[in-house]
Amino acid sequence: MAGLVSLWIAIASPINALDDYLLAAHMIQHFILMSIAPPLIVLGAPTVPLLRGIPRWFRVVLRPFFRARWLHRVVRFFLHPLTAWLLMNIAYLGWHVPAAFELTFRSEAIHQFEHACFFLTSVAFWWVVLAPWPARRVWPRWAVIPYLLSADVLNTVLSAILAFSGRVIYPSYLHAERISTLTPLQDQIAAGAEMWVLNSIVFLVPAVVLTLKMLSPRSLQGLSPSLKAN
């Protein structure tokens, strides 16, 4: 439920109305679509109970579809850690390129497609991190740490560009109606700071928690002597 509520906040609350006027509000929207709603939805994904709750006759109808090898291959491809990492970061960086970003102001359909790209690729990204039951990890658990840290590096680069460029990168915000006391450049600096701090928290906190868990005595007991020495 929390995931659906956060998704509603991103696309149907006043934040959605402000994104044409304030880049800072727009980046909050992107943050919710990529870093709040997806992990919450993955954590609450009732996959098995939902399937078991389907009427028996309907399960019989769906069984050939869910057992299709091509479907399993497609799901495995998109939920593979490397694929999920690349898709999420390509969407994140690609849509923030000025030429692509400006297209979202010219077409509502493109704007919604951008949001769909952010959300769906982020669901795959966080699925790898959280691995909700009955999912099985493709990579060892420790690999989640560089998986998250490398994503944070790219986030830091993009955030720093917005915060320290010294000029307004997205022309549409130069001409947007001013609904706050912030100048367009100040608005962009605030947006970059938001992205930097909020996304870094979301990436770094689970990486640190996982690191501490793996370094705990209980976890170390399960390692071979050679790994402990390293």
Q: What are the functions of these language-model segments?
A:
Residues 1-230:
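Alpha-helical membrane segments of multi-pass proteins
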